[in-house]
């Protein structure tokens, strides 16, 4: 049992209220002006924000098969440090969770080592990127969160349509990395001014938007919940907006780096700045920000993608795609958008908690009496510089090295258990 004393919570109007919070038996037992108990542990939250634990539906934990990049243990420790209490793990592992047996082994490893709640995706196709569909029913029974071939777009419309019909029959979502392989052209960055300046092959916007346009029509025909991963282009935002207006069950996420950066921020041919989707144009970034504010884009997800140093400390042509994000998402977004009065604090918290929960029907994301005690305590006054050497993640690959941010998680509780406290050793 914990009593979080002298903290602040956000009410429905977005106003801060001084409150104590009692955690008992894994639940939020009481929220009141003052709580006094004779037993349990007191946590001093004076002047700090007590918020629902963050939810990230797009995380690469790399295990099994990529433990040199990340493990379930290190990735979930990073999640806890970043304030995340629920994360969804992508299936681009070796082996791929494309069968009941592999999924059950993965679930057992998660239960054994994870520091936060991990909901694993199953793949859509066997081995990722094939045209052979997995056994949807068996994988749902084994605990799959949803189905995705993340990292690879499903190339054949017929394969995607059949997958959507099977997912819809089980009331499960198809989650898509949207990329038409015939339109990538071997690109490593956005097909724009940086690619032209550096003489690099570019990935055009249509590689993403064309596949989303196809898929929303397939989702309409199949009656399926279709979720777009890491949306990055203005055309994609327009397609999703039109689909929502037409009543199609489509949702979309955006990553922090696509909201904060565009291609003009890239300093040179440096593998630390290589990600997929790539950093797009200023116009694309503006469309993402507009889409998030008007509800076209539903929430924020990190696409945490750790790699070993030797896979990133090389030119873009040789580097792996991806950056880490779990430990820096909140401070970066709070600094860039709340501190500048572009967003309210409540908007940011909602996009990291209740919005993803609502999209995927998860019973988390709210701080109310009776809810699961998934909680992050945030010090909105704390200022610190992003230093990969302090990361709990094995991945140190971030373009935000040296950036000073304000607003950091200082404690994280999962089902009432303290899983991270600032100042304690890794």
From Swiss-Prot:
Q: Which InterPro entries match?
A: Amidohydro-rel, DHOase, DHOase/Allantoinase_Hydrolase, Dihydroorotase_CS, Metal-dep_hydrolase_composite, Metal_Hydrolase
- TM helices/strands, residue ranges: none
* Binding residues annotated for Zn(2+) 1, in chain numbering: 58, 60, 150, 303
The record's cofactor note says: Binds 2 Zn(2+) ions per subunit.
Is Disulfide bond given among the entry's keywords? no
Q: Where is the active site?
A: 303
According to the UniProt entry, what is the EC number of this protein? 3.5.2.3
Matching entries from SUPFAM superfamilies are given as: Composite domain of metallo-dependent hydrolases (SSF51338), Metallo-dependent hydrolases (SSF51556)
GO terms of biological process kind: 'de novo' UMP biosynthetic process; purine nucleobase catabolic process
Task: State the needed cofactors, names only.
Answer: Zn(2+)
GO MF terms held by the record:
allantoinase activity; dihydroorotase activity; zinc ion binding
Q: Which reaction does it catalyse?
A: (S)-dihydroorotate + H2O = N-carbamoyl-L-aspartate + H(+)
Q: What is the similarity comment for this entry?
A: Belongs to the metallo-dependent hydrolases superfamily. DHOase family. Class I DHOase subfamily.
Q: Which HAMAP family match?
A: PyrC_classI_B
Give the protein's function.
Catalyzes the reversible cyclization of carbamoyl aspartate to dihydroorotate.
From the Swiss-Prot or TrEMBL record, give the protein name. Answer: Dihydroorotase
Write down the species: Listeria welshimeri serovar 6b (strain ATCC 35897 / DSM 20650 / CCUG 15529 / CIP 8149 / NCTC 11857 / SLCC 5334 / V8)
């Amino acid at each position: 049992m914990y009593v979080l004393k002298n903290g602040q919570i956000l009410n429905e109007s977005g106003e801060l209220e001084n409150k104590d919070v009692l955690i008992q038996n894994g639940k939020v037992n009481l929220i009141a002006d003052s709580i006094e108990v004779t037993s349990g542990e007191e946590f001093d939250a004076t002047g700090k924000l007590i918020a629902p634990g963050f939810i990230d539906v797009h995380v690469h934990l790399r295990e099994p098969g990529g433990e040199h990049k990340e493990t379930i243990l290190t990735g979930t420790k990073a999640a806890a440090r970043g304030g995340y209490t629920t994360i969804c793990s992508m299936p681009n592992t070796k082996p791929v969770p494309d069968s009941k047996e592999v999924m059950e082994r993965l679930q057992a490893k998660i239960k054994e080592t994870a520091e936060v709640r991990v909901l694993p995706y199953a793949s859509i196709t066997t081995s990722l990127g094939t045209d052979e569909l997995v056994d949807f029913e068996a994988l749902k029974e084994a605990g799959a969160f949803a189905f995705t071939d993340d990292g690879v777009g499903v190339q054949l419309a017929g394969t995607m349509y059949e997958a959507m019909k099977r997912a819809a029959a089980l009331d499960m979502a198809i989650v898509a990395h949207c990329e038409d392989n015939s339109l990538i052209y071997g690109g490593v960055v956005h097909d724009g001014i940086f690619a032209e300046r550096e003489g690099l092959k570019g990935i055009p916007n249509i590689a993403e938007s064309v596949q989303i346009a196809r898929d929303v029509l397939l989702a309409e025909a199949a009656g399926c919940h279709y979720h777009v991963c890491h949306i990055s282009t203005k055309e994609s935002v327009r397609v999703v907006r039109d689909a929502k207006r037409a009543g199609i069950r489509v949702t979309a996420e955006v990553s922090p780096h696509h909201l904060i950066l565009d291609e003009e921020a890239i300093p040179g041919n440096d593998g630390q700045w290589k990600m997929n989707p790539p950093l797009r144009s200023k116009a694309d970034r503006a469309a993402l920000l507009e889409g998030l504010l008007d509800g076209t884009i539903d929430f924020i997800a990190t696409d945490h993608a750790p790699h070993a140093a030797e896979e990133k400390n090389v030119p873009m042509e040789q580097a792996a795609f991806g950056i880490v994000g779990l430990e820096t998402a909140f401070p970066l977004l709070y600094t860039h958008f709340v501190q500048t009065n572009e967003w309210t604090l409540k908007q940011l918290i909602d996009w990291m908690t209740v919005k993803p929960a609502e999209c995927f029907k998860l019973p988390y994301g709210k701080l109310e009496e009776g809810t699961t005690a998934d909680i992050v305590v945030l010090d909105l006054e704390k200022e610190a510089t992003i230093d990969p050497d302090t990361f709990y993640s094995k991945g140190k690959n971030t373009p935000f090295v040296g950036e000073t941010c304000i607003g950091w998680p200082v404690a994280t509780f999962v089902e009432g258990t303290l899983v991270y406290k600032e100042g304690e050793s890794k």
